Amino acid sequence: MKTFESLFAELSEKAATKQAGSLTVDELAKGTHFIGKKIVEEAGETWIAAEYEGADRTAEEMSQLIYHLQVMMIDRGITLEDIYKNL
């Protein structure tokens, strides 16, 4: 099972090595605006799932939202510590 920290480490490694075929690398290459649109899309899907589709589907959408948030963190140079100090 992945944790927030292990996912961030995995995505950071893919970004640093520019791993061929990586969706993360592709998303980072498309830039902040594209990543932001993905975050908004997944946030909306999370809300709809919570309203109408149950806990399992909501958790799935939340995991996708977390993924795109972490890609944005990498894009903007934001660390886990930056997030933790603001919780």
Curated annotation (Swiss-Prot):
Database matches in InterPro entries: HisE (IPR008179), PRib-ATP_PPHydrolase-like (IPR021130)
Pfam families: PRA-PH
GO biological process terms, semicolon-separated: L-histidine biosynthetic process
Subcellular location: Cytoplasm
Gene3D superfamilies listed in its UniProt record: MazG-like (1.10.287.1080)
A cellular component annotation (GO) from this entry: cytoplasm
Keywords: Amino-acid biosynthesis, ATP-binding, Cytoplasm, Histidine biosynthesis, Hydrolase, Nucleotide-binding
Catalyzed reactions: 1-(5-phospho-beta-D-ribosyl)-ATP + H2O = 1-(5-phospho-beta-D-ribosyl)-5'-AMP + diphosphate + H(+)
Enzyme class: hydrolase
EC number of this enzyme: 3.6.1.31
Molecular function GO terms recorded: ATP binding; phosphoribosyl-ATP diphosphatase activity
Pathway membership: Amino-acid biosynthesis; L-histidine biosynthesis; L-histidine from 5-phospho-alpha-D-ribose 1-diphosphate: step 2/9
HAMAP family referenced in this protein's UniProt entry, alphabetically: HisE
PANTHER family per record: HISTIDINE BIOSYNTHESIS BIFUNCTIONAL PROTEIN, HISTIDINE BIOSYNTHESIS BIFUNCTIONAL PROTEIN HIS7
Entry's family note: Belongs to the PRA-PH family.
UniProt protein name: Phosphoribosyl-ATP pyrophosphatase
Species whose genome carries this gene: Bifidobacterium adolescentis (strain ATCC 15703 / DSM 20083 / NCTC 11814 / E194a)
Gene assigned in the entry: hisE
